[in-house]
């Protein structure tokens, strides 16, 4: 197993727009000394840049307005039977709006519809809605026990990776200011400000393409497993160019909040539009409202029949060519 430590941040002014990622100075320069004095574990990913707050607030308001008017259509349904349905959640809509409209599209007045999985506001793709409390409990248990296989696809702007496939294990938790951060794997179980604990998270990444060049044509190496820990950074990037378009496929083993987004930030390939985690907001003359992350596939055993099910959502425009 390799040891990996990587720091990423952005330079910005009060009125700047995020246009490209930068390698960072050590995170300890950004942390308040009081947190260190209390012996809390130190996050090893950069905090959200100040400019992201206003952008995220505006996006949230726009999503609330859009969600209030949202209704599922038959074209959004990817799979359905008497126990559950899978839908293709659009970008920029809250999960609750999708759940609210589900009974209407199937002409069912039942109040037992539940979200089996949740997607971030700007993440699109496969979302499962159960039709009874009993089925919901079974699927939640399956997700918790990592029995459901998930794959996502993301478009990132950052430094060209020199790896083809890598599994990243780290800690996950909220820093004292409430932001989700990456922590060292050795910190799992330690107490955080506010009384929560560092929890484990693990994601496997595969490079799909770099600047539209397919994986098979890239001169990349397989890296078996990287444990995020204190120590020298052994998983390096392929060059000094920090404006490379990298499409990756992600397979999260755990299901932590913002997990893929955090690990992409940590690896130096933040997701395009993901300003909270240092993704570019403006790039090549365009602005991007929301991050480019799509839940493309869920594979599971049916909670009632036991049949194997593979549910795929159509790829968004930015991934369709990959």
UniProtKB/Swiss-Prot annotation:
SUPFAM superfamilies: Pseudouridine synthase (SSF55120). The keyword RNA-binding applies. InterPro entries: PsdUridine_synth_cat_dom_sf (IPR020103), PsdUridine_synth_RluA-like_CS (IPR006224), PsdUridine_synth_RsuA/RluA (IPR006145), RluA_PseudoU_synthase (IPR050188). This is RNA pseudouridine synthase 1. Gene3D superfamilies: Pseudouridine synthase. It comes from Arabidopsis thaliana (Mouse-ear cress). GO terms for molecular function: pseudouridine synthase activity; RNA binding. The lineage of its organism: Eukaryota, Viridiplantae, Streptophyta, Embryophyta, Tracheophyta. Its EC number is 5.4.99.-.
């Amino acid at each position: 197993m390799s040891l990996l430590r990587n720091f990423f941040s952005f330079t910005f002014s009060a009125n700047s727009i995020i246009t490209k990622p930068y390698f960072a100075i050590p995170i300890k320069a950004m942390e308040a000394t009081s947190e260190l004095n209390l012996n809390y574990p130190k996050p090893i990913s950069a905090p959200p840049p100040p400019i992201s707050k206003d952008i995220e607030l505006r996006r949230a308001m726009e999503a609330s307005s859009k969600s209030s008017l949202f209704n599922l259509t038959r074209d959004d349904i990817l799979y359905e039977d008497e126990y559950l349905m899978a839908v293709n959640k659009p970008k920029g809509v809250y999960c609750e709006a999708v759940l609210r409209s589900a009974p209407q599209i199937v002409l069912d007045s039942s109040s037992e519809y539940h979200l089996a999985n949740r997607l971030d506001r700007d993440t699109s793709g496969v979302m499962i809605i159960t039709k009874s409390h009993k089925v919901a409990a079974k699927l939640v248990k399956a997700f918790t026990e990592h029995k459901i296989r998930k794959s996502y696809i993301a478009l990132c702007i950052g430094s060209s990776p020199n790896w083809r496939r890598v599994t990243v294990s780290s800690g996950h938790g909220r820093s004292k200011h409430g932001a989700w951060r990456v922590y060292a794997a050795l910190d799992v179980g330690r107490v955080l400000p506010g009384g929560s604990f560092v929890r484990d998270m693990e994601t496997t990444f595969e490079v799909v393409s770099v600047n539209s060049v397919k994986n098979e044509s890239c001169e990349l190496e397989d890296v078996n497993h990287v444990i995020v820990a204190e120590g020298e950074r052994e998983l390096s990037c392929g060059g000094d160019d920090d404006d490379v378009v990298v499409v990756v496929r992600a397979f999260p083993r755990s299901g932590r909040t913002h997990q893929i987004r955090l690990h992409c930030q940590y690896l130096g390939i933040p997701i395009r539009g993901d300003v909270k985690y240092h993704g570019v907001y403006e790039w090549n003359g365009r602005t991007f409202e929301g991050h480019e992350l799509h839940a493309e596939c869920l594979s599971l055993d049916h909670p009632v029949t036991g049949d194997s099910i593979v549910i795929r959502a159509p790829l968004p425009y930015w991934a369709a060519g990959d």
